[in-house]
Amino acid sequence: AVPCATWLDGLSEGEQAIDELLGLLIGKGAAALNVIPDRNWNIADPETRHLKVQKLHAIAKMAGALDLPLNVGTEMNSPGNRLVDDFAAPAMAPLNGAFMAGAYFIYGHTVLQSTRGWGYQSDWARTHLPARRARNAFYETAGRRATPGEDRMRRLFDLPSASSPDAVLNALAYDY
């Protein structure tokens, strides 16, 4: 698992001291930040929408500066919410790159953890990728390359257990 800090909307007392809060959570092991974007832009009141969109953009920028990939999604446990976020909405479009990078990061971690036990928190990752920025970049790249398919997964299984990150990415490389 990738320990995720969470962010609601930046309005609570704790989230108003977000630098301090994220510093504490990173110190406790948080490696990504979970946000639910829809509740921060899909709001009828224009003033509230403007404020929450500003805060959403600010937290996305801060997450990037702190090397915290963004994990985004909807609140499917609440009636009336979307099944999938609308990343093309004007308020969301500027964040699309960060949202997709976070999705690839999570997918890369999931593929490598489930196939080889080489997920983000693994001994393998800590040995080969001790710096958070390099580790994040590796798992994002792995996620971009890890297209579904038996052949690609077999290549991962065939790697020696002491394989380097470059060898792993090469095993996931496109065939064309």
Report the location of each language-model feature:
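Charged catalytic cores and adjacent phosphate/nucleic-acid-binding surfaces used
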Residues: 1-176
